[in-house]
């Protein structure tokens, strides 16, 4: 992989963090984004120790001005944008459909769906004139199945997969690719919050055929491959 410029949202923990480290080990130039400045700066220091150029910029993907500025800063700093990993997400409020509110719906969809849409919009604004680029949206295994008690989160991930498929068709033949990675149960802070108790977490693990959770590093390796020319 030739020193691509990689932008990762939701990069400070879990899959996003592991993906940043995996790209750094490939020699990429990296921009990581999130909403916790101290954590972001520590991650950048770790990436630079690997020997790559890296920057952290704060952005809230729910706000278009933040997303626009994040992409513009990336291009100003590095001159281009080759790969974008849209990983920012929230598990939202669990519970039955009858327990949800307009507010709980909006809180999840603004990050998980609108955030991905705005990110793709501004990433493509740069990539299409370049005639090259690769976008990877991070969904979930719940993007293609149902799950009782998680209707809003599940719905948001179905939306991410639908948007990804549509965007991929829109840019076909331009030199830009849009793909989705849909991890199964992965050992992250989000999963711990989602399952809520050790008993629930153990019950989830029992449904996995290999009887263990995936690691963020395993998912990161998939993202790096899907983003690369080897998957084109």
Map each language-model feature to its residues.
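The beta1-alpha1 cofactor-binding region of Rossmann-like NAD(H)/NADP(H)-dependent oxidoreductases
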Residues: 37, 59-70, 102, 217
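Conserved glycine-rich cofactor-binding loop
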Residues: 12-13, 36
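Alpha-helical segment proximal to the catalytic Tyr-Lys
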Residues: 125, 169-173, 232
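C-terminal substrate-recognition "lid" of short-chain dehydrogenase/reductases
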Residues: 212-232
């Amino acid at each position: 992989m030739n020193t691509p410029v990689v932008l990762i949202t939701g990069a400070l923990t879990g899959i996003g963090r592991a993906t940043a480290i995996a790209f750094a080990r490939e020699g990429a130039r990296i921009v990581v984004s999130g909403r916790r400045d101290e954590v972001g700066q520590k991650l950048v220091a770790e990436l630079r120790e690997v020997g790559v150029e890296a920057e952290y910029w704060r952005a809230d993907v729910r706000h278009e001005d933040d997303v626009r500025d994040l992409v513009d800063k990336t291009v100003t700093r590095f001159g281009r944008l080759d790969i974008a990993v849209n990983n920012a997400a929230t598990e939202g409020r669990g519970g039955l459909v009858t327990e949800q509110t307009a507010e709980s719906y909006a809180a999840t969809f603004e990050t998980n769906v609108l955030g991905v849409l705005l990110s793709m919009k501004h990433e493509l604004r740069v990539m299409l004139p370049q005639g090259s680029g690769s976008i990877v949206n991070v969904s979930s295994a719940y993007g293609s199945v149902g799950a009782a008690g998680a209707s809003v989160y599940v719905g948001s991930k179905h939306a991410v997969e639908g948007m990804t498929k549509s965007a991929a068709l829109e840019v076909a033949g331009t030199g830009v690719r849009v793909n989705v990675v849909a991890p199964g149960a992965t050992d992250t802070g989000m999963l711990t919050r989602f399952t809520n108790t050790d008993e629930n977490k153990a019950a989830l693990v029992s449904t996995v055929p290999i009887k263990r959770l995936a690691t963020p590093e395993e998912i990161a390796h998939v993202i790096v491959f899907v983003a690369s020319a080897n998957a084109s």
